[in-house]
Curated annotation (Swiss-Prot):
Binds 1 zinc or iron ion per subunit. Its cofactor is Zn(2+); Fe(3+). Its main location: cytoplasm. Catalyzes the hydrolytic cleavage of the carbon-nitrogen bond in imidazolone-5-propanoate to yield N-formimidoyl-L-glutamate. It is the third step in the universal histidine degradation pathway. N-formimidoyl-L-glutamate binds at residues 140, 315, 317. It is found in: Cytoplasm. It is an enzyme of class 3 (hydrolase). One of its GO terms (biological process) is L-histidine catabolic process to glutamate and formate. Its EC number is 3.5.2.7. The gene is hutI. Belongs to the metallo-dependent hydrolases superfamily. HutI family. This is Imidazolonepropionase. Keywords: Cytoplasm, Histidine metabolism, Hydrolase, Iron, Metal-binding, Zinc.
Length: 407
């Protein structure tokens, strides 16, 4: 690959629409790393004569980061969508064997090749919107062989597509049917057999747990966190989605990368997250899809300075969403975030939620040249439009990996 000077662009280098350069340039080394960013009038002499790529006045942002997804699974759950429309709650469906457990059955029955093919169809729309890094969780296998297949497929997606994939082991997602009434025994299996085996195979970047009334208790969640700590793995938590169970405070005690959902988060949990540097990952797609009514405590998070990230939470039961731009719109319209908060939420703060702030979410010398090109007049349009393709080009490691004739 040759070195390139990208020019005639408007630059939002760090995901903050209030910190931009109107006439900017980006020098990218032949190895795909950024050599320099700044005003076009200040291009250092060493880069002036490099081959140029004219972006015709478009905006450039860091590649987007989807920091919470369940992208790999078998089947779909449109039938449960119809049940919810008829009045059934998420908890009611789960308690009678639907919900997560129905996807577990479909995932266990699917081959690795079938899981890969289905996941590809879900990933492509995200990549076309400028996503260059994504987190993918397991958690629909709930036994070693199926969890392994899910994580292997996630790794394969990162090898086959121009996207950095971060894998999260979510064995403690739900209680599998064969362990009904024996949750502690299942946590034994997660901590003593599944996690060690998958970590030894290099399939796990982080560990998550669903701490909720219909999930796992604080004590069980802590056992999973302890098992992760023994392996030197960072942790995350699904917390306070359906009730205030104190999960966020536990996550903070283990210096979790993130606590996610958080509709029922209280002031004590917010303060704990601030003290531990834990990112709040908000998931407006799930909030919208299950018709939740309790909003996350946005003002408390702001007041305490807790970083807010946004993610699709793509999953078959509560957020079959494959658009991070629509997620931004929902974050603004439903959660009343500002455009600044929404864009930071899918760039810099989303990278922090993955423990990858040194690799993603910002454009600076020495980092990989992962960026998205937007032929819009203002960055507010990224959160304003929905159902309209906006991304003109995606660059990953200095190489154009997606283009759309948007003009």
């Amino acid at each position: 690959m040759k070195s390139i000077l990208w020019h005639n662009l408007k630059l939002c280098a760090h995901g903050d629409p209030n910190d931009t350069i109107a006439d900017a340039a980006i020098a990218v080394n032949g190895d795909g790393t950024i050599a320099w960013t700044g005003r076009a009038s200040d291009v250092p002499a060493g880069y002036v004569h490099w081959p140029r790529e004219d972006l015709r006045g478009a905006w450039v942002t860091p590649g987007l980061v989807d920091c919470h997804t369940h992208l790999v699974y078998g089947g779909q759950r449109a039938d449960e969508f119809a049940q919810r429309l008829a009045g059934a709650s998420y908890e009611e469906i789960a308690r009678r064997g639907g919900g997560i457990v129905s996807t577990v059955r479909a995932t266990r029955d699917a081959s690795e090749a079938a899981l890969f093919e289905q996941a590809c169809a879900r990933l492509r729309p995200l990549l076309a919107e400028g996503v260059t890094a994504i987190e993918i969780k397991s958690g629909y296998g709930l036994e070693l062989a199926s969890e392994r297949r899910m994580l292997r497929v996630a790794r394969q997606l990162g090898e086959r597509f121009p996207v950095s994939v971060y894998t999260t082991f979510l064995g403690a997602h739900a209680l599998p049917p064969e362990y009904a009434g024996r949750a502690d025994e299942y946590i034994d299996e997660v901590c003593e057999r599944m996690l060690p085996a998958l970590a030894d195979e290099g399939l796990v970047d982080a560990v998550d747990v669903f701490c909720e009334r219909i999930g796992f208790t604080l004590a069980q969640s802590e056992r999973v966190f302890e098992a992760a700590a023994r392996r030197g793995l960072p942790v995350k938590m699904h917390a306070e989605q359906l009730s205030n169970g104190g999960g966020s405070a536990l996550a903070a005690r283990y210096r979790a990368l993130s606590a996610d959902h958080l509709e029922y988060l209280d002031a004590a949990g917010v303060a704990a997250m601030r003290a531990s540097g834990t990112t709040a990952v908000l998931l407006p797609g799930a909030y919208y899809f299950i018709r939740e009514t309790k909003l996350p405590p946005i003002d408390l998070l702001r007041r305490h300075g807790v970083p807010i990230a946004l993610a699709t939470d793509h999953n078959p039961g509560t957020s079959p969403l494959t658009s991070l731009l629509l997620t931004m719109n929902m974050g603004c319209t439903v959660f009343k975030l500002t455009v600044q908060e929404a864009l930071l939420g899918v760039t810099r703060h989303a990278a922090a939620a993955l423990g990858a702030s040194d690799r993603h979410g910002s454009l600076a010398p020495g980092r990989q040249a992962d960026f998205a090109v937007w032929p819009v007049s203002t960055l507010a349009e990224l959160a304003y439009w929905f159902g309209r393709p906006l991304c003109e080009r995606v660059v990953k490691g200095g190489v154009t990996v997606f283009t759309r004739d948007a003009r």
